[in-house]
Amino acid sequence: MRITLPSGTECEIDRTVANPKMGLVIAPDIFSLRGLYDVLVKRLANEWQMAVCAVEPFPGKTLGPEIEPRFAAVPELDDDKHLRDLHEAADALGTAEVGLMGFCMGGMYCFKSARSDRFKKIISFYGMITVPDGWKSATQGEPLEFLKNG
């Protein structure tokens, strides 16, 4: 089910499991929320018996299926706003404990989320440990620095 966070960012959420022991926030790859994540959210909720939410990484943008506009949009992303969205998604799950899982660009944001105590466990798949040159900007911190400094 699609919801809108207080920030205005869209998420796919599944809270159908009764009394979940834990919640899971998913940070998608550069291709954003799509059918793949709708299925993944539902599947992980059912198989792992938890509340699950996937967060749109490019809120308010229509980037299309090509990768070039997406690469060009990454420097415009703001680490603080992205972390806020991940926190709001965690709150929407309604569980005391929440993990964070990310894929590729979302995995990089998992590393950047190490500065927060909100997530009990963080799992990054293929996340960049340094910001690629074409993505660097004043609003993009270095993942290794966030991991190092917490």
Regions found by a protein language model. Name each.
Residues 44, 113-114:
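Aromatic pocket-lining residues of Rossmann-like dinucleotide-binding sites
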Residues 1-94, 143:
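Serine-hydrolase catalytic machinery in alpha/beta-hydrolase-like enzymes
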Residues 102-106, 110:
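Gly/Ala-rich beta-loop-alpha elbow adjacent to hydrolase catalytic centers
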